[in-house]
Amino acid sequence: MMKAIQRFGGALFTPAMLFAFAGVVVGLGTLFTTESIMGPIAAAGTTWTKCWTVILDGGWTVFNQLPLLFAVALPIGLAKKQAGRCCLEAFVAYLTFNYFVSSILSAWAPELGVDFSASAGTAEGIATIAGIRTLDMGIAGALLISGVVIALHNRFFDTRLPEWLGVFSGSTFVYMVSFIVMLPIAVVVVLVWPKVQVGMHVFQQVILDAGTAGVGIFVFLERVLIPFGLHHLLYAPFYYDNVIVQGGIYAAWANALPGLAASTRPLAELAPWASLTDRKSVV
């Protein structure tokens, strides 16, 4: 059991390998487009700002598509066979799941108590994933769907079909089964996840109101889990997902830099979530 959990924690770290370079690009792009730091050269409309904005937008690729990356990357560490094909199956199944959720909400959002007309990325819990308006489940939704697909892949990938159905074997058969499974999961998610989002908002406030005590508990638990290789399970939702702040703490840092640089107010007021940042945690 412990080995399985450790493998899961290690698989979670796979997308994190991309964060170092992406973080450097975002950091430099944000720095060089902040007028209060760079001066008039970084004013809006200058060639300097336009060029660095292009680079900055490219740098956000990893952080803006985190759920998709986690959905695709998890099979690399957990699929027992043909991991590459499992990644493809997870990718398509995850998109299928989100299309199901989007279609259900388009038809029954008022009855489900969801404001599906809200802008993506707001507190209303709506997100856009690969161009699909859906519920904002962050990496939790990606891990759920990817985990289901991995289980189906390990179980059905080698299923023997009659010769005349051979075209449906392998990855095609896994996707067929996944397609069927995604629909009831989508139904359950649209019923349950809005209530989970309410609980997450309460949890965010509790952690922020706890101040140094909350930070101390977080850091203590993280350090305790490091010898077991399970610390990724604790910090990933805080740093890369919406548990504390929309988009994750690291993405929030980059977004907040221009405002922080231009303000004279204490950091504790401008970014109370910043106290949970621990750069050593990503090692």
What are these model-derived regions, one by one?
Residues 282:
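Conserved small/polar residues in nucleotide/adenosyl-binding loops
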Residues 66, 74, 113-127, 189-198, ...:
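Juxtamembrane/interfacial segments around transmembrane helices
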Residues 186, 193-252:
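Aromatic-rich transmembrane-lumenal/periplasmic boundary elements in polytopic membrane proteins
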Residues 15-32, 88-102, 177-187, 221-243:
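Hydrophobic alpha-helical membrane-insertion segments
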Residues 114-117, 124-136, 148-149, 153-211:
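Membrane-interface helix-loop-helix junctions at boundaries between adjacent transmembrane segments
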Residues 37-45, 238-278:
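Membrane-interface interhelical connector segments
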Residues 2-162:
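Early transmembrane hairpin of solute transport permeases
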Residues 12, 134-141, 175, 179, ...:
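Hydrophobic alpha-helical transmembrane segments
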